[in-house]
From Swiss-Prot:
This is Anthranilate phosphoribosyltransferase. It catalyses: N-(5-phospho-beta-D-ribosyl)anthranilate + diphosphate = 5-phospho-alpha-D-ribose 1-diphosphate + anthranilate. Anthranilate 1 binds at residues 81, 112. Keywords: Amino-acid biosynthesis, Aromatic amino acid biosynthesis, Glycosyltransferase, Magnesium, Metal-binding, Transferase, Tryptophan biosynthesis. Mg(2+) 2 binds at residues 226-227. It comes from the Bacteria. It comes from Ectopseudomonas mendocina (strain ymp). Belongs to the anthranilate phosphoribosyltransferase family.
Length: 348
């Protein structure tokens, strides 16, 4: 199937099979489609709603074409979201990665610049001084020595360059928002993934089940956030032991007080970084303490997904203890320092 045939199917509100989606994605990712065709395809898929078969097909092609990162670490975990929730909250999952590392976890963080939001994970880390142009083996060394390595999506998904223009011009969430968290170049099989709609939680978990993931929590908060929220109950679809279960959690389940998100929104990466540094440091402001609580909730989920904790409650306690040692902030500075060395190596 080619993209023109696929567009005719989508206009008629007909779904594609996994194999048909793979064929179309290969056309897109190898530069055989025009920007207009790609834009129409992305919007058509969104209006129709993507099926599990379609997402599996698209993700499998992206994985196939990705530049891999080989990391010698057990229970490698990724913390990321689809983006597109429109909430403009600080970079919770990126901050959580450093808390996970401080607690002894190994994080292969996969991310990009903001597409529809104010601050993507790459924007935040760059603002902090992290060098993004790492080679695969340098990412592996970051994970092994610091506990966190960042894989800048464009460096590992070169074929994505063909869709960057249409995505940016649309400025809306598309199937690619869903694919990012499912195409970790290091092959992390343990993840916490925030999604922009509760309706996506179970389908995403089922897609990851088919793609071979081991322990994943897909989350969406009642207030619309694609993170575990401090302000509202959060719906969770958990993939564990080959089965998907669904449940709701709230901050009080972990002895954390529910609070509003006021003060946690940002307009740019620099504001996000300032809030995160306060949260991971001495928490001198009320907003810094709130941000810390939210980071702990999400880092705790990641420690549980990585099987460093036997329950969510235990994971949150481990995250709380790790954050309050100050080691998480040190991990951020360690990553900045190590990537600066790699930058010198790469640029001579």
């Amino acid at each position: 199937m080619n993209i023109k045939e696929a567009l005719n199917r989508i206009v008629a509100q007909l779904d594609l099979t996994t194999e048909e989606m793979q064929a179309v994605m290969r056309e897109i990712m190898t530069g055989q489609c025009t920007d207009a065709q790609i834009g129409a395809f992305l919007m058509g898929m969104r209006m129709k709603s993507e099926t599990i078969d379609e997402i599996v097909g698209a993700a499998s092609v992206m994985r196939e074409l990705a530049a891999p990162v080989v990391i010698d670490a057990e229970r490698l975990v990724d913390t990321c979201g689809t983006g597109g929730d429109g909430m403009n909250i600080f970079n919770v999952s990126t901050a959580a990665a450093f808390v996970v590392a401080a607690a002894g976890g190994k994080v292969a963080k996969h991310g990009n610049r903001a597409v529809s939001g104010k601050s993507g994970s790459a924007d935040l880390l760059e603002a902090a001084g992290v060098y993004l142009g790492l080679k695969p083996e340098q990412v592996a060394r970051c994970v092994e020595s610091v506990g966190v390595g960042f894989m800048f999506a464009p460096s590992h998904h070169g074929a994505m360059k063909h869709a960057i223009g249409p995505r940016r011009e649309l400025g809306l969430r598309t199937i690619f928002n869903m694919l990012g968290p499912m195409t970790n170049p290091a092959g992390a099989r343990h993840q916490v993934i925030g999604v922009f709609s509760q309706a996506l939680c179970r389908p995403m978990a089922e897609v990851l089940q088919r793609l071979g993931s081991e322990h994943v929590l897909v989350v969406h908060a009642q207030d619309g956030l694609d993170e575990i929220s401090l302000a509202a109950p959060t719906f969770v679809a958990e993939l564990k032991d080959g089965k998907v279960s669904e449940y709701r959690i709230q901050p009080e389940d972990f002895a954390i007080k529910s609070q509003s998100l006021i003060g946690l929104t940002v307009d740019n990466a620099e504001q996000s970084l300032e809030l995160i540094r306060d949260a991971l440091g001495r928490r001198k402001t009320e907003n810094g303490q709130k941000a810390a609580d939210m980071i702990v909730l999400n880092a705790g989920a990641a420690l549980y997904a990585a099987d460093h904790a036997s329950s969510l409650r235990e994971g949150v306690q481990l995250a709380h203890d790790a954050l309050h040692t100050g080691l998480a902030r040190e991990k951020l500075e360690e990553l900045v320092s190590l990537t600066a060395v790699f930058k010198q190596e790469n640029e001579g």
